[in-house]
Curated annotation (Swiss-Prot):
Residues 1-22 form the signal peptide. This is M-zodatoxin-Lt7a. GO terms for molecular function: toxin activity. Keywords: Secreted, Signal, Toxin.
Length: 97
């Protein structure tokens, strides 16, 4: 989620930079864009540090491990639920007989 916030901020910044430019020479635009991109890079690095995203691949790895654990717990829960349903079904048949 944090990654998407940073990506959205980057996209908005690029759109704002593109919209705010008036007709200038190509060199002046390139120089201004380079300065703006440097400022934007510093700003986004600050955001990433604040959100502790500098090790994002590790974060993705951790999410994968968490998802695998959750998947195993859900599978175990489902198996117990099926067993319980079979027990209840057997009890119901016994009572009806």
């Amino acid at each position: 989620m944090k990654f998407y916030v940073v990506a959205l901020a980057l996209l908005v910044a690029f759109v704002c930079i593109a919209e705010s430019r008036s007709v200038e020479t190509e060199r002046a635009v390139d120089a201004d864009l380079e300065d703006d991109l440097d400022d934007l890079e510093e700003y986004l690095e600050g955001i990433a540090e604040a959100l502790e995203l500098e090790d994002f691949p590790d974060t993705e790895e951790a999410r994968g491990e968490t998802f695998d654990k959750l998947k195993e717990k859900l599978k175990t829960f489902y198996q117990k639920l099926v067993e319980k349903a079979e027990d209840l079904k057997g009890d119901l048949k016994a009572k009806l007989s």
